[in-house]
C-alpha cells in the first residue's frame, strides 16, 4: 500500500477526497484529516526557526499563518481549481478584501462587474475608497465599456462567474484577454460556479476567490474563504505590483516573486496581510469545509438537477412575471451558459412574482421547506427578498442597475426531493391567489 500517489492523474471526484492527504496522517495513521488544534509549532533548532521566518524553508511558523488542517484544505482547493497554491481565510469577505487590497494598494483602481454580491459591491463602492482604492462599476458584458473604464492606475478587473443575484454570466475568455492586453490580472469570484462546474483559470483567470461558506462547505455550518493563485501572472512585467515583486522591508528585503516564484501572490497575502491583520481560519472550520469538499460533485449534480426542474416550473407558472436563469433560451447569457456550464448550474437565481414587494413578502413568508436567510448554496433550499435584505444598502438607482426589483425573489435550490420543493413553492403561490 506504499508508494507516491500522483493526484494530477486522477479525476475531480477522486481529488476532492484525497488531495492534501494522499496517505494516512503520519503521526497517527488516521485516515480522516485530523484537527490540529494548536497555536504554534516547535522548531528543531535556532537555524530551523530562522529559516522558517525568512521564508527559506516552507512550513508552519505560527497558527495565524498556517495550520496543518488548513494546509490540506488549501492544497485540495488549489488542485480542484487548477492553481499552484491557495490561502484559506476566515470568510469569503476576507478573501475578496485581501485580494483587492493587495492588488490596488496605494491609490490603485479596480474595474468591477456591477452585478455582483451586495457585500462585494459595498466593499468596492464605500469601504475600499477609505483606504485609497477606487472602483468603476461596468456592464461586464460590454467589453468596450470595460476597456474604457481602465485607467493608468487600474490594477485588476473583478468579476463573478455567476452574478449575484440574477446569475448573469460574463465571458471569462474575452475578459482575460482584455485584462492581459493591459497588463492586468483578472480576479474571478467562483463561489456560485464552484470548480466542479467551471474552472476560471482554464479560461485565463489569474486569481480565483471563493466564499467557502457556500457550496464548498455546503451545509450552512461554517464561515470560510479561499484565494487561489493561478501562478501564471507576471508580477514583475508591468512594474505596477512592487509589493509582490520588489524587496519587502518587513522580510529583510525578500522579493516574493524571487523567493517563491509562481505562488508569489498568495504567499504575499499570507505573509503580509494575514500576518498583520489576522483573518485566520480556525482548524475546526477548515476541517468542516473539508467534509463539504468531499461531496462537492455529488451535491452540485443534485443542485443542478433540481434547479432545472424548478426553473421549468416557475417559467410556466401564471403568477410568475419573469424567471432570470441563464439556462433559458430567452436569457441574454444563454450562449455563454452553454459554453461555460455544459453540466448545468446556477442553482442561485431570481424570479419576479406578479405584483410587488407585498406579494413577494407574502410568498416568502408562507414557504415551509425554504428557509428565509441570507446564506445561499446550502444543501437546504433557501429564499430571500434581495431589495430589502442582501442588497438593501443600494440606492434605488443602483438596484435598478443591477436588475433587482421590488417583486424580485432570490432562490437557492437545495438537495431535497424535487416534488417537495415544487409543492412548497406552489403553496406560496396558492396563499397569494387566495388573498
Predicted segment positions?
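PLP-dependent enzyme catalytic core of the Aspartate aminotransferase-like
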Residues: 4-6, 84, 125, 134, ...
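Conserved C-terminal alpha-helix-loop-beta "cap" of PLP-dependent enzymes
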Residues: 300, 308, 315, 319-409, ...
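Short amphipathic alpha-helical segments
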Residues: 58, 84, 285, 289, ...
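Conserved PLP-enzyme active-site core in the AAT-like
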Residues: 8, 16, 20, 24, ...
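Short, acidic Gly/Pro/Ser/Thr-rich loop/turn segments
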Residues: 24, 42-46, 234-235, 296, ...
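Conserved N-terminal alpha-helix of the aminotransferase class I/II PLP-enzyme fold
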Residues: 45-97, 119-126
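N-terminal "arm"/small-domain region of PLP-dependent enzymes with the aminotransferase-like
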Residues: 2, 8-67, 75-76
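Active-site beta-loop-alpha junctions enriched in small/polar residues
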Residues: 162, 191-193, 328, 354, ...
